[in-house]
Design a protein with these regions (language model features):
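A short acidic (Asp/Glu
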Residues: 21-22, 66-68, 93-95, 284-285, ...
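Short S/T/G/P-rich N-terminal loop/turn motif that feeds into the first structured element of a domain
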Residues: 1-51, 60-62, 73-79, 85-88, ...
Length: 432
């Protein structure tokens, strides 16, 4: 099994060069915000291990909201983020990008502070890699190659299988045998591929096991202290929840139209959001701990198609900026934006509160998990205000939703079974 990983490179945009950067990024698209896989600057389609990628200018329109807490508006930079979700270690993917697309990357990064076009590109990229606070992968081990091969397999079988009803259950097993022979012939001829999974890297297995044990162990060690401090921590939390300002006005119509202009060109969409963490050590400490726990569940529990009860997210992550004064969230999800938000409100509003209620202006919560995102209008206004346009977005398998990936995988698994009953053969044929 090849595990997946994600990365985000962040660099400060040089003052006065943002407009030129945006114009360059626009040349990489075939549709608004949708990358041309073969664009001349960074041809994402040439990188066979890359699931998703994006380039986004992180210009936070809500920086002034923190003044509602009696804190002066900070002077924080505009950043450029290069983000990727890939098969295998993120470091290898970054190195591959630097080696094979160095000329285009230099054209992009020349708009950033401290970039030397004649210097070591890979070293610069590694130095600007941002550690992710938590990240989610829908199905650990499902590679780009597997997705494309199984999609081609489904199309080939669907075109071959007869549409007339079968005369008997026994005929289903015979037809399945014929289809297996057909696939074997197509694989031998090189027209189809069914590549077996690679061995799971030992280093990844060891790291996962250590992480599985280390976080609960740390929790046990700290438990006595938390019990002693819990009355004080609860008092601080409830005081802040009762007094923190809400900032949830409707988003400006022009901003909303700009965001919507970049959506719904495919069955999958992108989401990029940024916001300030509420001032004070308590909120900074609490959001850090909660994201450690969210990351733990994503790495060890939610690895097979679900993030809690939500099934429409391919990849997502949280990352801190500016010494944990700001938080970035990015995701790739199936369906429209409104349905995506409704999915969270109806199924895991408590999870939204855990992760995001530490942001300035979030709808007021109770006991950390209640209210907040459940106040639909306020939540939807809030998230749109904090959403940023994604200037360039790439996905390796357009037109294929997570439901399709699961369906295609079931077809392949049924094909590779050594023997099946007549009932199983009929059920498998119905998948086609």
């Amino acid at each position: 099994m090849t595990p997946q990983s994600q990365f985000m490179l962040v660099a400060q945009v040089t003052r006065g060069r943002e407009r030129g950067l945006r114009e360059l990024l626009e040349t990489m698209n075939s549709k608004p915000g949708m990358a041309d896989p073969a664009n001349a600057v960074l041809p994402f389609g040439q990188f066979e291990r890359l699931h998703f990628a994006r380039l986004a200018v992180l210009d936070d329109p809500t920086l002034g909201d923190i003044e509602a807490h009696g804190v002066p508006r900070p002077r924080l930079p505009v950043y450029l983020a290069l983000v990727g979700s890939c098969d295998g270690p993120a470091g290898k993917c970054i190195a591959d990008l630097a080696q094979r697309a160095g000329t285009g990357l230099r054209r992009i990064f020349m708009h950033c502070d401290g970039f030397d076009a004649q210097g070591d590109l890979l070293a610069w990229m590694q130095a600007h890699r941002c550690q992710l606070a938590a990240d989610y992968i829908n199905w650990v081990g499902r590679t780009v190659r597997q997705i494309k091969e199984e999609s081609a397999l489904r199309r080939a079988l669907a075109a071959k299988v007869p549409r007339a009803p079968l005369a008997s259950a026994a005929q289903a097993r015979q037809l399945r045998r014929e289809l297996i022979d057909f696939v074997d012939a197509e694989v031998s001829a090189g027209r189809l591929g069914l590549t077996p999974p690679d061995p799971t890297p030992l280093r990844w297995q060891i790291a996962k096991l250590l992480h599985l044990v280390a976080i609960p162990l740390a929790g046990l060690i700290l438990l006595p202290l938390l019990i002693v401090l819990s009355p004080l921590l609860i008092l601080i939390l409830r005081t802040k929840e009762n007094n923190d300002p809400e900032i949830c006005p409707p988003v400006d119509r022009a901003v909303l139209l700009e965001l919507q202009h970049l959506e719904d060109y495919d069955v999958t969409n992108q989401y990029t959001a940024i916001g300030s963490v509420k001032p004070g050590l308590f909120r900074r400490w609490l959001v850090t701990v909660l994201l450690v726990l969210i990351d733990y569940t994503c790495r060890h529990i939610f690895t097979r198609g679900f993030l809690a009860r939500v099934q429409t997210i391919h990849f997502a992550f949280w990352a801190f900026l500016d010494d944990k004064r700001r938080l970035v969230f990015m995701s790739n999800y199936d369906g429209g934006h409104e349905a995506y938000m409704d999915d969270f409100i109806n199924k895991v509003a408590w999870g939204l509160n855990l992760a995001f209620s530490h942001g300035v202006g979030w709808p007021r919560t109770r006991w950390l998990v209640a209210r907040g995102a459940r106040i639909e209008n306020k939540f939807k206004n809030y998230q749109r205000r904090h959403q940023l346009p994604t200037q360039v977005w790439y996905r390796a398998y357009p037109g294929i939703a997570l439901a399709d990936l699961k369906h295609n995988q079931r077809i392949r698994e049924g094909l590779e079974l050594a023997s099946v009953t007549e009932v199983q053969a009929q059920a498998w044929l119905r998948l086609l």
